[in-house]
């Protein structure tokens, strides 16, 4: 006695099931024939969960479920617990090419940075944000308070921001969460109202479990910031930059001035946040840095062994294009625990 039979059809990307009894005459649709029996054997009814492109199955089992005598679908390893599909991170279809340079030292990003988001304030100021999973993005705390008073709260900020992912795909913001020490750690999180569909144009970047911000390591920073003629760019671009020596970066900002802005001492008239939670990238005589509008973008590092892209940092400070040679980034390893905790609690 074979018991009840579940006939399955994978139609497009949806899984459909038809229920029937043992009697093959009960099957009215010949697209679902009853499996033929064999001598000295039996038919085992099972199905397998598959993942869509740009997702992976998260399960301790193999995704295969069989029908037991209690008419329950059971996996040998996890029982009736179902697998989950989670988005792939850090696997762009068209990774950055370090050879194809364009005017101004920046590079044209053709789907190379699918984690890059564009955020626009209520006064039309453009900044960056970085997708880290299907529903959350990292950006700077300063970005979240653009055009707001000192007394503004995170709740005040969220409704005034417009956010785009991929190619101008508008997404709605549910809430923003500031780092508890955002005056020293210039970071905030954005939660979307709905999860985004991950594809070749929209994909999160991975968060690292180790420090990739080693002096001399080259990373890639993308954004819609100003070019070196101080015009906002229409297309996403990127630049390659090495991690700089922190002490040299600190001396640069402490000892440099411009004639019209001598206080505080800094090449751009304001002092960046430099502490154990930050690192610098760029070179002292290099004119191909990121520019105003890129804050919130990731310092993306390619791990060649894993063939995976990680966010080593989030750009916090770089407002001058050709004046300040170093950009300042918040280390993602410094905020990783807070990020995971905040996402879990929200």
UniProtKB/Swiss-Prot annotation:
Disulfide bonds join 249-280, 291-321. PROSITE patterns: TRYPSIN_DOM. Its main location: secreted. Residues 102-344 form the Peptidase S1 domain. It holds the Pfam family Trypsin. GO terms for cellular component: blood microparticle; extracellular space. The gene is HPR. It comes from Pan troglodytes. Primate-specific plasma protein associated with apolipoprotein L-I (apoL-I)-containing high-density lipoprotein (HDL). Binds hemoglobin with high affinity and may contribute to the clearance of cell-free hemoglobin to allow hepatic recycling of heme iron. It is found in: Secreted. The uncleaved signal sequence interacts with HDL fluid lipids and mediates incorporation into the HDL particle. Keywords: Disulfide bond, Hemoglobin-binding, Secreted, Serine protease homolog, Signal, Sushi. This is Haptoglobin-related protein. CDD domains: Tryp_SPc (cd00190). GO terms for biological process: zymogen activation. SMART domains: Tryp_SPc. Belongs to the peptidase S1 family. One of its GO terms (molecular function) is hemoglobin binding. Residues 1-16 form the signal peptide. Residues 32-85 form the Sushi domain.
């Amino acid at each position: 006695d074979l018991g009840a039979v579940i006939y399955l059809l994978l139609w497009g990307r949806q899984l459909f099931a038809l229920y029937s009894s043992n009697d093959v005459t009960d099957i009215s649709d010949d697209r679902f024939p009853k499996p033929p029996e064999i001598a000295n054997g039996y038919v085992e009814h099972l199905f397998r969960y598959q993942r869509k492109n740009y997702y992976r199955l998260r399960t301790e089992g193999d995704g295969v479920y069989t029908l037991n005598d209690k008419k329950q679908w059971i996996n040998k390893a996890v029982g009736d617990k179902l697998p989950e599909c989670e988005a792939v991170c850090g696997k762009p279809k068209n990774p950055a090419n370090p050879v194809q340079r364009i005017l101004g030292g920046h590079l044209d990003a053709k789907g190379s940075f699918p984690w890059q988001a564009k955020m626009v304030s209520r006064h039309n100021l453009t900044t960056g944000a970085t997708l880290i999973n299907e529903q959350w993005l990292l950006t700077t705390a300063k970005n979240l308070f653009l055009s707001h008073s000192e007394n503004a709260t995170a709740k005040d900020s969220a409704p005034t921001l417009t956010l785009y992912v991929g190619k101008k795909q508008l997404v709605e913001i549910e809430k923003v969460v500031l780092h508890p020490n955002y005056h020293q750690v210039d970071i905030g999180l954005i939660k979307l109202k709905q999860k985004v569909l991950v594809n070749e144009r929209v994909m999160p970047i991975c968060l690292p479990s180790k420090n990739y911000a080693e002096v001399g390591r080259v990373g890639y920073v993308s954004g819609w910031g100003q070019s070196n003629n101080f015009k906002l760019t229409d297309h996403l671009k990127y630049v390659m930059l090495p991690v700089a020596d922190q002490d040299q970066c600190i001396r640069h900002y402490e000892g440099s001035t411009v004639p019209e802005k001598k206080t505080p001492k800094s090449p751009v008239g304001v002092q960046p946040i430099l502490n154990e939670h930050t690192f610098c990238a760029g070179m002292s005589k290099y004119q191909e840095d990121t520019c105003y509008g890129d804050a919130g973008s990731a310092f993306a590092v390619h791990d060649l062994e894993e063939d995976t892209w990680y966010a080593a940092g989030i750009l916090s400070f770089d407002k001058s294009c050709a004046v300040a040679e170093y950009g300042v980034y918040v280390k993602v390893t410094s905020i990783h625990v807070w990020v995971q905790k905040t996402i879990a609690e929200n």
